[in-house]
Amino acid sequence: MSAGWRTLLLRIGDRCPEYGGSADHKEHIETCYGVLCREYEHSKDAMFEFLLQCADQLPHKIPFFGVLIGLINLENEDFSKGIVDTTHANLQDALHNENRDRIRILLRFLCGLMCSKVVLPNSIIETFEALLSSAATILDEETGNPSWQPRADFYVYCILASLPWGGSELFEQVPDEFERVLVGIQSYISIRRHFDDIAFSVFETDEGNSPNKKDFIEDLWERIQVLSRNGWKVKSVPKPHLSFEAQLVAGVSHRFSPISCPPPTISQSSSEIVKGQEKHEADLKYPQRLRRLHIFPTNKAENMQPVDRFVVEECILDVLLFFNGCRKECAFYLVSLPVPFRYEYLMAETIFSQLLLLPNPPFRPIYYTLVIIDLCKALPGAFPSVVVGAVHALFDRISNMDMECRTRLILWFSHHLSNFQFIWPWQEWAYVKDLPKWAPQRVFVQEVLEREIRLSYFDKIKQSIEDAVELEELLPPKAGPNFRYHSDEGKESTDGHRLSKELVAMVRGRKTQGDIISWVDEKIIPVNGAKFALDVVSQTLLDIGSKSFTHLITVLERYGQIISKLCPNEEMQLLLMDEVSAYWKNSTQMIAIAIDRMMGYRLLSNLAIVKWVFSPANVDQFHVSDRPWEILRNAVSKTYNRIFDLRKEIQTLRKGLQAAKEASEKAARELEEAKSIIEIVDGQPVPSENPGRLRRLQARADKAKEGEVTTEESLEAKEALLARGLEESKELLRLLFKSFVEVLTERLPPISADGDVPNLRAGDPNVNSSARDPEATTMEIDNENGGDNDSQLNGQNKKISHNVGELEQWCLCTLGYLKSFSRQYATEIWSHIAMLDQEIFVGNIHPLIRKAAFSGLCRPTSEGSHL
């Protein structure tokens, strides 16, 4: 075999040239083991490390690696004992460093080693019981901290997740002890708090509050119980050890030492706010790995058992995790999982579940975009049609989709189409033109087309929908500037045209910013006022920078001080944004870019941007366009990115300051030591060191001290900037929530006399009442127990009417974005929650506002200003 042992280890279990195209797992293991034996004496240390690395980063192949280690164990017990001991050290380290993925995978690896007779089954039981004991302690009010239930849930999840990989062997070899573990899990399930993840649901529905809906742990426990009743038979987990059982049984099984879990974090206060902050911190450290999104009917699952679905999901997530950044390898492993059934539909559901995972996907959305593209190319006869079906299914439910997920879906879909020549059966969606302008399906198509134009050009996208000419109405205007002082309009005689020409001439003449500011102060403001001056200057500079992004940035860099001088307060900054919006009225992209760049150059404050977004003209667009929300997202994101960057810089400077102090002290010490060495010359003590060396030491000490002072000054400056940034962020949150509350309070329907909260989704009976389709079907909301979906999800052309009134749709969209911002910036909000409770969430605030804001924080709506 020409392939090296490393390649054979990596490709084991795959149908590949290294194994002659064979898919026989037994043959793979024999071939690989033979090569390992030949190379053992020369490469045993490298094999040791590489086997551990493979098990860590190719966890879906752990059964194969376990058998190889088991076979080596027959010849060299020390090698396998070292594997076991190193695994124990790695698991102990992962527990104390809260490395979630490593804990989960190492427990699976232990099960793989146990199946191959390398680890004693009783040791696995002891490990499980240690984790269960820690989980139960965390939930104890006196000795633990129930706010940290996510950590306890994670420990139990790790146990449950490893059982498909070793439950059968534990049941056969240590049945009584294994039953004790299962009883302990049942006991834990009975005392834990049910987790209602409505804040993280992709779809907004009333069913999300159903007490019968299982959370992720309850669902996984049910799957394991079904597996137990079926005799622990799992089709999705390879069992290569069974082919070598007669050999492996002769090996010596090693004991896995007991583990210790980190003690629970004790709560420092009984305050509900502190408990909420602790729970939020726990959720961040131990997030739920997957929230299932059932897109397709269950008959697409190839008769997959509940636990098989879970195992394949885990394998898909592992590949996505470890091959992030290696897209080709990622696609290869995704399509070649060692399972005996087709799983394209499940793979699509899992990837879309990650893309739409709230509050954030594990990786940047572009990663999932590239993975889907590569899978379409790797499986051209199967996966593209699966993606089409998924898009149609999600589109059918777009009206109930979370606003953040809707935005991600728009961005993904437009990018995906750009890689396939923008080909899509648009005629199937042509009916959306006849829906109200606020209908979510119509807005979705409109926003996708707008994003496509950003990625291409107007005429190309117009051509792509030629089979659905009705949709041309949804295309944005052809992008181009709207210069108020254009010379072709025949209005050159006006003051604005004349002054604009003068300004252009000054820019072309390379006049300095000071010269132009003086010209504005002398020629425009005294005669026409500051607002007119801002109008002329901003329109003209925007026109000069309109050729490209680079031109715009150059103009802002060179002449930003002129705009800054004209916009000393928020009132003038609001006018500046009006000018930007007027100039680029035909280009949402350029408005967003210009405002974002102006904020970057501090020509616009984040508070001014929030006020502008919540101005009447923009508020009226909340439900029909993403334009105001994109600008608001950019402003809030940039604010917190600055703070994040400053914290990183401060952390680096603190390390640098410590190093500078040590260097300064060392240089000073060397200088003093040199000076202290004296000798007697003519009866007088004089330094014995060479004067030249003393001068060098003095210079080095001075330079080191100077470096220390410089670093300390830089640190103080950055800390001052951070303090200012934190204060600005506090004001931003105050204004943001105040603005949401004000506009929503004005428009939300009042509570009834009986105290009933209005149902916004009931809709206006006068909207599309004659066009409603009683046969219209929708996809079931994602439920953890894998219930059947009622809808037909093969991408048929189904006309779905919209029966929600415009006011109700506006309220739904705005409440959705309030929830989205609360969820996205929950960490920052929790640090200022007392202020928000006292100033914003007070009085008779509408319960729908409180629900949206608090659900984003995973905070009970009963909490608030009384705390």
From Swiss-Prot:
One GO term (biological process): defense response to virus
Entry's Gene Ontology molecular function annotations: mRNA binding; RNA cap binding
Chief location: nucleus
Oligomeric and partner information: Component of the nuclear cap-binding complex (CBC), a heterodimer composed of ABH1/CBP80 and CBP20 that interacts with m7GpppG-capped RNA.
Family to which this protein belongs: Belongs to the NCBP1 family.
Task of the protein: Component of the cap-binding complex (CBC), which binds cotranscriptionally to the 5'-cap of pre-mRNAs and is involved in various processes such as pre-mRNA splicing and RNA-mediated gene silencing (RNAi) by microRNAs (miRNAs). The CBC complex is involved in miRNA-mediated RNA interference and is required for primary miRNA processing. In the CBC complex, ABH1/CBP80 does not bind directly capped RNAs (m7GpppG-capped RNA) but is required to stabilize the movement of the N-terminal loop of CBP20 and lock the CBC into a high affinity cap-binding state with the cap structure.
Biased segments, Polar residues type: 788-797
Keywords, ordered alphabetically: Cytoplasm, mRNA capping, mRNA processing, mRNA splicing, Nucleus, RNA-mediated gene silencing
UniProt keyword Protein transport present: no
InterPro entries: ARM-type_fold, CBP80, MIF4G-like_typ-1, MIF4G-like_typ-2, MIF4G-like_typ-3
SUPFAM superfamilies to which the protein is assigned, alphabetical: ARM repeat
Residue ranges constituting the MIF4G domain according to the UniProt record: 9-228
Subcellular location: Nucleus; Cytoplasm
Protein name, as recorded: Nuclear cap-binding protein subunit 1
Region (Disordered): 752-797
GO cellular component entries: cytoplasm; nuclear cap binding complex; nucleus
